[in-house]
Amino acid sequence: MNNKSNFKLEPDVLLQIYTTMRQIRAFENTTDELFKKGIVKGTAHSYIGEEAIASGVCTALDEGDYIASYHRGHGHCIAKGADLGRMMAELFGRKDGYCQGLGGSMHIADMDLNILGANGIVGAAMPLSTGAALAAKLRGTNQVAVAFFGDGASNQGIFHESLNLAAVWKLPMIFVCENNQYALTTSYRNTTAVAQVAQRAAAYDIPGITIDGNDAVEVHLTVLEALERARAGEGPTLIEAMTYRWGQHSLRANLQDPRPKKEVDSWLERDPLKQMENRLLSKKVASKKDIKAISDATNKEIENAVGFALKSKEPDMAVMLNSVYAPHKDHIEPGSTCNRTLSFVEALNEALHQEMALD
């Protein structure tokens, strides 16, 4: 993959990427503050320091493309266009949240936006995205599915199973490994045999590339190239975006941070938001006044989202019970006949097809 020079980013795209990064940073800073006050329920995993990845990826996607996320998923949902008020309400455990307050931070989904959901199960985004990509290919819709996951998830069996199937069937997929260096408290260097996760793509004969995950433009251009391959029927791409989470594993973390201070400080100096801001200024895409206006506007958006969430009601017990099962569908079982002779395997297959059609 070396055709990134074929793509030129217009000023409006650069501003869109930066604005999205600003939204994510403001949302996460506010989430952190409200968690400490006990307003955010459960736990949450901050995306601060990794904003360039979600913004660079999702601004390259078409509206109909799919994404699936993981426990550190606020940024992905925001970048794909999720409603900030409903997201905040979900974190508050309120009825107007995406899951009516029952899912919390790790389970935000919006099927209208093809956000298949964040997920508390490590690596679960990959099979969900693989299924979405298979459906898109069978329907011939030209949609692409993106799976976001961390470096720790690349050591799960489902990583290899998903890459293998996607490669065999040449599914329109992009696997985005957000390598923030640590799976909870364990460095990926102590758990991963290869130097880079992207090297594992070779086993499935698909492109694998390691990029600077703090450079939103590099992320965006790399994804544009992967999208071009996917829509052309050439199959999936594995992108490893090297980055760093600024805080501990979660906002509720009560473990000693094992990361060396010198290492943390060096990554903090590589602030992806500041890098993008400097790019806009140096290329005269935006002035300092424009930057401030974007910052003020995004802060106001988050303020409004908090206000919406605070006004939302707590879910009642009926919601808890009614949300457990899917709506029941009555259907009449086909009557039995005795005018055909079927083998056991044929009868079993026919019954399965009937049940699948009724599901």
Model-identified regions with their sequence ranges:
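Cofactor-binding active-site loop characterized by glycine-rich and histidine/acidic residues
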Residues: 29-32, 39-169, 187-193, 198, ...
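Gly-rich Lys/Arg/Thr-decorated short loops/hinges at beta-loop-alpha junctions or inter-strand turns
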Residues: 36-39, 107-115, 141-145, 176-182, ...
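Long, amphipathic alpha-helical stalk/connector segments used for oligomerization, subunit docking
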Residues: 228-235
